[in-house]
Amino acid sequence: MAKRRPPLDAPAEAASASIRYIESSALLAALLEQDAEAIQDLRALGQRVTSALTFSEAARALIRARVTGRITSNQERQALRALRTFERRIAVVALTSDVLVRAGRPFPVEPIRTLDAVHLATVELLGEPPQLVTIVTRDERVRANARALGYMVS
């Protein structure tokens, strides 16, 4: 289950009113590209939630970016510090067998990659009404499926 910690920069009443599921592509847009819209989406009001998978994906993407010369070692260290800070300020949902079973089933818009299916399964298994959940993503496959499942997308 999730470690339930309201984000440090969100008022308690806003945190209980809506959930913002942060998918790894949005987090990476903020970390690697300093994308202003992604940064704003990450800081928006609401209870922020993500899968434990997000942090492995992000760390691997940062390593890949350094190894391929996209970022320097110093930039990687700074991004990893920002990633760890973000991890302390968000509710993290464990990668459970229920999530993996759901991820292995069909989604409304196929094909979808396995890790994207894990993110969508995590959102579904939160058990919240879709109209109260916004999925923050930059991935078109995740967007299409989120909308088809009734979730808002940012």
Report each predicted region and the residues it spans:
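Alpha-helical scaffold domains
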Residues: 44-45, 86, 105, 149
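Short loop/helix-cap segments at secondary-structure boundaries that form the rim of catalytic
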Residues: 39-43, 143-151
